[in-house]
Amino acid sequence: MKRKYTIYGMMALVVLAFSSCQLGKHYARPELNLPQQLDSTEQDTLSIADRQWWELYTDTTLQALIERTLEYNKDMKIAAARVKELAAMKRIDFANLFPQVSGKLYADKEAENYGGDNYDSDRSYEAKAIVSWEVDLWGNLRWAKDKSMADFLGSIEAQRALKMSLVAEVAQAYFELVALDNELAIVRQTLNARKEGVRLAKLRFEGGLTSETSYQQAQVELARTATLVPDLERKISIKENDIAFLAGDYPQKIARSVLPEEVKLPESLPVGLPSTLLERRPDVRQ
């Protein structure tokens, strides 16, 4: 009887040891008792984030610039390489769950020379097949597979977040560059008007119609406007270099379109549900 209790006790200890070696449990999304419809969801649940970037930016020049950036940007290449690396690790961890088969082939040749034409050689061949299988007793291999899958999916989301960031940065820099072009064009028009004003002020001064003060004031306005041109040209050059850097190029001129003076914007943009916006956050998805 005592021996029977001892066996039961040992079995309980074994079960306890197995349960204590469990690494963790799979995550299950909790079920929430929420109402079918909220008062705040009467608006359209469609978000502007559901649209592709080429649907938002219809400028063909900008589209080509974004495509080149996504293809040649150095950070984007690193992210793509990281995805490939983790995809390979995922396949390796998945393969570790199954038996491993390997083979080896040996070839050997022995030769003996007894002098003269007395020559003897012996060749031998040997082949070996090795089968190994690690029993996943504690779940280490399964959890390693799950971890590699999570890392792989996280790298995809990181690449997606980088893509969205690059698209936004290129589009913003592009529109800022076009705005600087328009500003420079206005300044140059103003500069031409100032030059004409100085010419007329000089004629009036020489004709005795105005004092020298008016003529000098026109010259001051001309000089002040002229200083704006090199400053805007410098800003344009810096912005072009920024865009070229994002595209993985050396500093160069950036082609751009001329935007119309009147741009029609939608009266409202669909923002979607707050919960949907939260799920789109790159850090949450990753």
Q: Model-derived features: where do they sit?
A:
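Residues embedded in well-ordered secondary-structure elements
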Residues: 10, 92, 118-120, 166, ...
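A generic local structural motif
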Residues: 89-90, 116, 229, 264
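Terminal intrinsically disordered/low-complexity segments used for targeting and assembly
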Residues: 4-71, 233-282
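Small/polar-residue-enriched beta-strand and adjacent coil segments characteristic
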Residues: 23-26, 52, 58-68, 72, ...
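Periplasmic alpha-helical coiled-coil/stalk elements that build and connect Gram-negative outer-membrane
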Residues: 150, 157-273
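A short structural micro-motif
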Residues: 85-89, 222-225
